[in-house]
Amino acid sequence: MATADHEATGLDCDHAIRRLLRRIDAHIADEPRDSPVRRYLERELGGREGTEADTRLVVHAQINVVRELFERRSDADGLRLLSNIERECC
């Protein structure tokens, strides 16, 4: 269900953020264990026991690192999803 302020766009922010986190997890798993980006994102995004709003804040705070990860992985779909989330959800 989209939040009230995002109903006009049709983007379900909570669902989009869950999709984004799955993409991040997949890319992190492919990064070398000693990758600074991997270690950083595992530390910052590792604990997701909070609410959807908490997760949204964490993603927003790490948006540039996530963008860097997607760029390094040439993930155009991930970058597009990230941009939509940044524009409509954060």
Curated annotation (Swiss-Prot):
Domain of life: Bacteria
Any one of the GO BP annotations: nitrogen fixation
Keywords: Nitrogen fixation
Keyword match Zinc: no
Keyword Cell cycle: no
Alphabetized InterPro entries for the sequence: CowN (IPR024899)
NCBIfam families membership: N2Fix_CO_CowN
Function as written in the Swiss-Prot or TrEMBL entry: Is required to sustain N(2)-dependent growth in the presence of low levels of carbon monoxide (CO). Probably acts by protecting the N(2) fixation ability of the nitrogenase complex, which is inactivated in the presence of CO.
Similarity annotation: Belongs to the CowN family.
HAMAP family: CowN
Protein name, as recorded: N(2)-fixation sustaining protein CowN
Lineage of producing organism: Bacteria, Pseudomonadati, Pseudomonadota, Gammaproteobacteria, Chromatiales
